[in-house]
Amino acid sequence: MNERKLNKDFLEIYEMSISGKIKKEDALEILKLDVYDLLHISYHLKKAFNKEKIETCSIINAKSGFCSENCNFCSQSIHNNSKINIYGLKSKEEILKSAKSIENYSNRFSIVSSGKKISEKEFEDILEIIDEIKNKTKLKVCVSLGLLNKSQLKALMKKNIRIHNNLETSKNYFKNICTTHEYEDKVDVIKNGKKLGLQICSGGIFGLGEDIIDRIDLLYELKELNVDSISLNLLNPIEGTKMREKINSKEIKSIEPIDALKSICISRIIMPERVIRLCGGREYVLKDLQSLSLLAVDGLMIGNYLTTSGRNIQSDLRMIEDMGFKKG
């Protein structure tokens, strides 16, 4: 392909993306481009929406393990055999201490709880913890608390915080990773939250054995739900999970770095105006290519994840700076 033709194709994709005219079949064709071409387009789309800053976020595993759901990738499920720390909801003091420790490095701090749902007592405790963090730090607070009901969503709306609820994968593929709750259960939480005016962060995991059509379907589901922030995770197959067994037995293949980058880029091209946030598994999958992802994303989770260790925070902040971006 000569340079003139390439530039014409870039411009056409760029303009289609800006105007929201990228269809599923277009996305599949665009993915045939070289990864560096996709990164080029993604970067210019970022610039078009003034996304020169990288919003950092961090999480605390506030309640760990003993989850009733059978998500085959999750080390916290009782249906898997991962060796993790199991504990109930941490105290207000512990969670506040964690928030303060990250305050100078992160824009957002999310309280994450294991399990399908939390009890009303736990929910009331978390509302108090939210107030404490908002009063004593400058962090924006988020929560990831499973399948929240309408009453809980209303209470969180009054606190003016963002909720997180991952769809994980496409509706069609979901039954391959979880059978103890329905895809629509998650969709309902997001829809109910949006109706109330809550900000929503949702996304999925690439590398669960899904095909590219499943990834595209997931992205369009997120687009149609109009979520504010798209959280992209890359599978880190944790020892003891059913997903790790599938990879060890060659039933499914681990996602390759270039494949992951292309999937991140198409997320930006489909939803150029949204926050595209790269989260868990980036160290494991992208390895030395992590910095390239910043050409497409404008959000980055830093610090440790739920049951796995993240990269050194200073290394991530230096990577952001070295790539010419600012923490925002």
Curated annotation (Swiss-Prot):
A GO MF term: 4 iron, 4 sulfur cluster binding
GO biological process, one term: biotin biosynthetic process
PROSITE patterns xref list: RADICAL_SAM (PS51918)
Residues involved in [2Fe-2S] cluster binding: 110, 142, 201, 277
Iron-sulfur among keywords: yes
Main enzyme class: transferase
Disulfide bridges in this chain: none
Residue ranges of every copy of the Radical SAM core domain listed in the record: 49-273
Classification via NCBIfam families: bioB
Protein name (database record): Biotin synthase
The encoding gene: bioB
